[in-house]
A protein has these predicted regions:
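Primarily the internal scaffold of c-type cytochrome electron-transfer domains
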Residues: 26-38, 42, 57-130, 137-142, ...
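C-terminal motif of bacterial Sec signal peptides marking the signal peptidase cleavage site
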Residues: 18-20
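Exposed beta-sheet edge/beta-hairpin loop segments within beta-rich domains
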Residues: 191-195, 331
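Long, basic N-terminal domains or extensions that often function
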Residues: 200-201
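Bacterial N-terminal signal peptides that target proteins for export
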Residues: 2-11
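Second-shell loop/turn segments in exported
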Residues: 47, 186-191, 216-219
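Local sequence-structure signature of Cys/Sec-based thiol-disulfide redox active-site neighborhoods
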Residues: 41-50
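Bacterial signal peptide processing site
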Residues: 22-24
Length: 507
């Protein structure tokens, strides 16, 4: 998700305060390979197929991943929506999703059957693979060179077409009382790639997407609409050339392999690979390419300064967000957890901290490989039967949450990556349904909290940065708030930035 917002000069200057609050990159036990990053251009990227011959095992893992199937051209292999001619009926139009010869298209007619417009589908994003609700979005290619989001989406989980409303940007199922002009993406205006003067979606929906305006047209190019190897590893053209020469004995002396190794990178460097897409960020300049410094192109914290801050005070998503709330997790703040602690970066399957493959997303070894003291008697920790959902680490500490910015009609839940402790009363006070409440909907939050207190006594307190924010009330003066909120000695960059944002906006 991209946040394009202008900030006042005092707010921008105040962010400099946070440099003293930033968490230093943790040291690793590996020495980094001596590799000087070259400048990066689109021509330096060669695509994943070029990696297959030398890395066949890893390529096969990637080929079956959600990244590899994240999008692509409109082909039978990629389309999951029913382009069968069954009508989508609106108040002032009828839309026929259909396949004519090899072309997928939306044929839009007036109610009397007169043709209004035909929009061909050039490409798709998504294949309905996400457990919490998978969707597919469609692009048309326009005469000005842009690829534009079309207004009709498909939910695999709901087995239905849906649209996004113009009035509140919520996702809703097709309703015959809706007009075409009620749809947020009609006429199509959101484009693939970052273009300053029109609504757009950034590089997350493809690999190495570059969009530039040239007079009245746009030059849009990309390596693929899947997430390829170079999205994480950076440009591989030089690497492929060097290694080919070495194999052919063209080069005998020692030299770099032409690509930066991911072995030994810091936790923050590893996270930034994923935060290219799995983060809410504010653009600083356009046309980022993998291999460049992400934070020269995006700020990962400035969205917290906006009026639509997507995070609650302890990091949980309150609108539409991504896994950036990992940075609120104690597993990160007090440990070294990055995305690959749980996710195989090539297959996207699940693994434990030692990189051992797990049987699935709900395998408790994802957590127990670190929290080994809980393994001997899990029921003593959970107060639930060992094989029940109440004894699942994920169910209690990473509950699935609907992204409320898009409403509740179309299921679109994602695991809460703050890895929080269930606190029914606190959770309710912040507008969240606690993990306990998700199963025990008939019990009040107060009674659930009493049960938690009875079982665990005094539970682990909130991080001081979060607890300090809770101390602020309507009578707190600016001077007192500054003492409580602006504490650079604590190590909680996201929480500190959120507190700074609150202080600036209120005081």
């Amino acid at each position: 998700m991209i946040y394009r917002r202008l900030f006042s000069k005092p707010i921008v200057l105040a962010t400099l305060f946070m440099f003293s609050c930033s968490k230093n990159s943790p040291k690793t036990s590996f020495d980094k390979i001596n590799y000087k990053k070259p400048s990066v251009s689109f021509a330096d990227f060669i695509g994943s197929n070029q990696c297959q011959s030398c890395h066949p095992d890893i390529y096969e893992q990637w080929k079956g991943s959600t990244h590899a199937m994240a999008g692509g051209p409109a082909t039978p292999e990629n389309i999951i929506a029913p382009f069968n001619g069954n009508p989508i009926t609106l108040k002032d139009a009828i839309v026929y999703p259909e396949k004519v010869n090899s072309t997928y298209q939306f044929r839009i007619t007036e109610l009397n059957g007169d043709l209004r417009q035909i929009v061909a589908v050039e490409a798709v994003v998504g294949k309905g693979m996400m457990y919490g609700g998978g969707t597919q979005t469609f692009f048309g290619k326009y005469d000005d060179g842009t690829y534009r989001f079309l207004p009709f989406d498909y939910s695999k989980h709901e087995a239905t077409w849906f649209v996004q409303l113009r009035k509140d940007e919520k996702w809703v199922k097709i309703d015959p009382q809706l007009y075409l002009d009620d749809l947020y993406n009609w006429p199509p205006h959101r484009t693939l790639g970052e273009i300053d003067d029109i609504s757009n979606c950034q590089q997350c929906h493809g690999s190495q997407i570059i969009a530039k305006k040239i007079d009245d047209v746009y030059d849009v190019k990309f390596t693929s609409l899947s997430i390829n190897c170079e999205s994480c590893h950076g440009p591989a053209k030089n690497h492929a050339t060097i290694m080919s020469n070495i194999v052919q004995n063209v080069v005998n002396e020692y030299q770099t392999i032409g690509i930066e190794s991911a072995v030994g990178i810091s936790t923050n460097e590893s996270l930034n690979m994923c935060f290219q897409c799995h983060a809410v960020k504010t653009p600083i300049k356009n046309n980022y390419l993998p291999g460049e410094n992400l934070e020269e192109f995006y700020s990962l914290k400035l969205p917290l300064l906006g009026n639509e801050n997507p995070f609650s005070i302890n990091g949980r998503i309150k609108t539409f967000g991504y896994q950036l709330n990992h940075l609120f997790s104690d597993c990160f703040l007090s440990g070294s957890m990055d995305c690959t602690s749980c996710h195989n970066p090539h297959s996207n399957d699940y693994q434990d901290i030692s990189k051992n493959a797990l049987i699935g997303r709900f395998d408790d070894n994802q957590c127990l490989s670190c929290h080994v003291t809980k393994t001997s008697d899990i029921a003593a920790h959970t107060y639930h039967k060992p094989e029940s959902e109440g004894s699942s680490c994920i169910a209690c500490h990473m509950p699935a949450r609907q992204h409320l910015a898009i409403g509740t009609e179309i299921k679109y839940t994602r695991a809460d990556h703050t890895v929080s402790i269930p606190r029914p009363s606190f959770d309710s006070s912040q507008g969240f349904e606690s993990a306990c409440k998700q199963c025990h909907a008939d019990i009040s939050d107060q009674d659930l909290q009493l049960t938690v207190n009875d079982w665990y006594g005094t539970i682990k307190p909130l991080h001081p940065v979060i607890a300090n924010r809770m101390k602020i009330n309507e009578r707190t003066t600016g001077a007192d708030a500054a003492k409580v909120l602006l504490q650079p000695n604590h190590e909680h960059p996201m929480g500190q930035f959120a507190n700074l944002s609150y202080f600036i906006k209120r005081y």
